[in-house]
UniProtKB/Swiss-Prot annotation:
Record note on quaternary structure: Interacts with PLK4. Interacts with FAM161A. Interacts with IFT20; regulating IFT20 stability and localization. Interacts with TTC21A; regulating TTC21A stability and localization. Interacts with USP16; promoting USP16-dependent deubiquitination of tektins. Interacts with DCAF1/VPRBP; promoting localization of the EDVP complex to centrosomes. Interacts with CEP350; promoting CEP78 localization to centrosome and centriole.
A GO BP annotation: flagellated sperm motility
Residue(s) carrying Phosphoserine: S325, S327
Basic and acidic residues bias: start-end ranges: 573-587, 666-689
Record's keyword terms, sorted: Cell projection, Ciliopathy, Cilium, Cilium biogenesis/degradation, Coiled coil, Cone-rod dystrophy, Cytoplasm, Cytoskeleton, Deafness, Disease variant, Phosphoprotein
Record-given protein name: Centrosomal protein of 78 kDa
Organism of provenance: Homo sapiens
Distribution of this protein across tissues and organs: Widely expressed. Expressed in different retinal cell types with higher expression in cone compared to rod cells (at protein level).
InterPro entries, per the entry: Cep78 (IPR026212), Leu-rich_rpt (IPR001611), LRR_dom_sf (IPR032675)
Coiled coil regions, renumbered to chain: 450-505
Keyword RNA-binding: no
Length: 689
């Protein structure tokens, strides 16, 4: 039917255009029932209005479609719901729609499977009142398993039974997007409820594993974002009973994700309600548990269950609300209208008939009769050939433009205020429909007061809960105020202790400041500098062995921050030797200058000044000098060296230069010895020249 791949791709994005194209290929017109909601972007139609030839283009378009967010197919053809045998025979003689044939339902499920497999926008799938067989459900379950976007699935009024539900459960068990399912009126028993309870347990295990993985490294898992069912609707399945309720109670006790469970008209008793109430003691996430329309449950038990569920729903505003009863409908929509058939004529092509719906019988008021005005005038149909006959086609066209008749409000009020006016209430069940005529005390009249009483009870319970919370908060407030006063008292005590400790530390710091005085530290540093200067002089004088004998290490001769003084006694440089040779006699002045320059070290408050070693006369230890001095003067070199050493020791042992000048005799002896040495050296120099 499709010749090119490009056309197929374009058709998948536009359902309406492709549906028109396929209808044109088979020389048919798109059905108004199908086109009604396509302009809104959804596919919603009554399947009873389609013939067999109309399904082919529709299913071919649906199979490849990718742009429909909602697909809703309904069927209301139920011939077994007739009241009497004559009604049953009338329905059986009428035309059976094509959707009731197994081939059409099988092709429909195949098309839905293809749409579910490829569509990424299909979120709602509703099949209402269809007869789905086992092979149809198997194909549909495969599509549900492959769907990546389906959120809501409804098979309401589809008599699939427990076996069909088990097949569907295989498709929805691993779905990551499906949130709500609706199996209202599907002829389920407690076994079907057990299948759904097993699905809940399976998804709970998977969610617990995902929760554990998300809680690692101190993370907080988001339960609302996890996959799984959030609402299950099983209304109007009277065979579920207490066994099904107990199965759900067992799975709900450990479930943290299901938000709503609807069990209206499911044949529950006090035993099943009690099991659900015990499950609510541990389950605080279920916000809707609808067990209404179960007459075997006591009013007190139902009130306790609803109260517990309402307490769970107060924590946050839930998106899942309480649904209305599926069996209560407006009387105007469910009341059957009697029809009168008029045969206009018969011929070779058939007979023309007109079916006219007559209004219900109106009661006659006591006193006067209501006369109808011109706006209520409806002439009786006339047979053909009579004067004033109106063809039925002309009547139908006129009816389209006539609109609704004008009805006065006071007439309706007068009719409703009459004591004998009947009120028709329709009560539907999965197996039959009953029409009852009751007085003003019908269920529909008392439905509004019942709702208001439930709302008042809910408000009263909410008020009691708020008062209880207020009382608890007041007690907590008193405890907190008492604790605050205790903490303030402790804070004052700690502040006093801190002040006393700070004063003690301040007094102790004053004593420690004495050791931090710069004068004391400076005097200690000066003492060490003098000692190191003494060690440097010993080393420069060639008396390092004396320091070693005294137990002073060689590394102690170096003072940190000051350059080490090197000895020039052993090997005097040539320049100094020439300068000594060039010196002429001025013995007295040189001796006095040498006496002034020979000092250990001038100590100041900040640094020390090294001695001028170049002007310090040191006996030359070279062999030439020793030889010349011994040969010329006849004085052994050892004696001369001994004399210089004794004089040096005498100077070193003196406390200071001022102390040596105080003792005149010692100073004169030193001057004489130095003069003698200088004169002897000069003589040796002159002789050598």
């Amino acid at each position: 039917m499709i010749d090119s791949v490009k056309l197929r791709r374009d058709s998948a994005a536009d359902f309406f255009s492709h549906y028109e194209y396929l209808c044109a290929l088979q020389n048919s017109v798109p059905l108004p029932a199908v086109r009604a909601c396509l302009r809104e972007g959804v596919l919603d139609f009554n399947a009873d209005r389609l013939r067999g030839v109309d399904w082919a283009p529709l299913l071919s378009t649906l199979k490849i479609n990718k742009d429909l967010p909602l697909v809703s197919i309904k069927s209301f053809f139920q011939p077994w719901l007739g009241d009497t045998g004559s009604d049953m025979n009338k329905f059986c003689r009428s035309r059976v729609p094509a959707i009731r044939y197994k081939d059409v339902t099988f092709q429909l499920c195949k098309a839905l499977k293809g749409c579910l497999s490829i569509s990424s926008v299909l979120k709602n799938l509703e099949l209402n009142g269809l007869i789905l067989r086992e092979r149809d459900l198997t194909i549909l379950a495969k599509g549900l398993n492959k769907s990546a976007s389906l959120v809501h699935l409804s098979l309401a009024n589809c008599p699939i039974g427990d076996g069909g539900l088990e097949i569907i459960c295989q498709g929805i068990k691993s779905s990551i997007t499906l949130k709500t399912v609706n199996f209202t009126g599907c002829n389920l028993t407690w076994q079907g409820a057990d299948h759904m309870a097993k699905i809940l347990k399976y998804q709970t295990m998977r969610r617990h594993e995902e929760t554990w993985a998300e809680s690692l490294r101190y993370r907080r898992p988001d339960l609302d974002c996890m996959a799984g069912l959030r609402r299950i609707t099983l209304n109007c399945n009277t065979l579920i009973g207490d066994l099904g309720a107990c199965a759900f109670a067992d799975s709900l006790s450990e479930d943290l994700w299901l938000r709503a469970l609807d069990l209206q008209q499911c044949g529950l008793t006090n035993e099943g309600a009690k099991a659900l109430l015990e499950a609510l003691e541990t389950n605080t996430t279920l916000v809707v548990l609808d067990i209404r329309k179960n007459p075997l449950i006591d009013h007190s038990m139902m009130k306790a269950v609803i109260k517990k569920v309402l307490q769970n729903g107060r924590s946050a505003k839930s998106e899942y609300q309480w649904i209305t009863s599926p069996s209560v409908k407006e009387p105007s929509k469910t009341a059957k209208q009697k029809r009168r058939t008029i045969i206009l004529g018969s011929g070779h092509k058939g007979k023309a008939t007109i079916r006219i719906g007559l209004a219900t019988k109106k009661p006659v008021s006591s006193g006067r009769k209501h006369s109808l005005g011109k706006e209520y005038y409806a002439p009786a149909p006339l047979p053909p050939g009579v004067s004033g006959f109106l063809p039925w086609r002309t009547a139908e066209r006129a009816k389209r433009h006539r609109g609704f008749p004008l009805i006065k409000t006071r007439d309706i009020c007068n009719q409703l205020q009459q004591p004998g006016f009947p009120v028709t209430v329709t009560v539907e069940s999965p197996s039959s429909s009953e029409v009852e005529e009751v007085d003003d005390s019908s269920e529909s009249v008392h439905e509004v007061p019942e709702k208001t009483s439930i709302e008042q009870e809910a408000l009263q319970e909410k008020l009691e809960e708020c008062l209880k919370q207020l009382k608890e908060e007041r007690v907590i407030r008193l405890k907190v105020d008492k604790r605050v006063s205790e903490l303030e008292h402790e804070n004052a005590q700690l502040r006093n202790i801190n002040f006393s400790l700070s004063e003690a530390l301040h007094a102790q710091s004053l004593t420690n400041m004495i050791l931090d005085d710069e004068g004391v530290l400076g005097s200690i540093e000066n003492s060490f500098q003098k000692f190191h200067a003494f060690l440097d002089l010993l080393k420069d004088a060639g008396l390092g062995q004396l320091a070693t004998m005294a137990g002073i290490d060689q590394s102690d001769f170096q003072l940190l921050g000051h350059p080490q003084m090197t000895s020039t006694v052993s090997n005097p440089p040539k320049e100094e030797k020439k300068a000594l040779e060039d010196e002429k006699p001025e013995p007295k002045q040189n001796a006095l200058g040498q006496m002034q320059n020979i000092q250990f070290q001038k100590i100041t408050g900040d640094a020390r000044i090294p001695l001028p070693l170049d002007s310090f006369p040191v006996p030359v230890s070279t062999p030439e000098g020793l030889g010349t001095s011994s040969n010329n003067l006849g004085v052994p070199a050892t004696e001369q060296r001994q004399e210089s050493f004794e004089g040096f020791i005498a100077r070193m042992c003196s406390p200071s230069p001022d102390a040596t000048s105080g003792t005149g005799s010692q100073r004169k002896e030193e001057e004489l010895s130095r003069n003698s040495r200088s004169s002897s050296e000069k003589k040796t120099k002159t002789e050598s020249h």
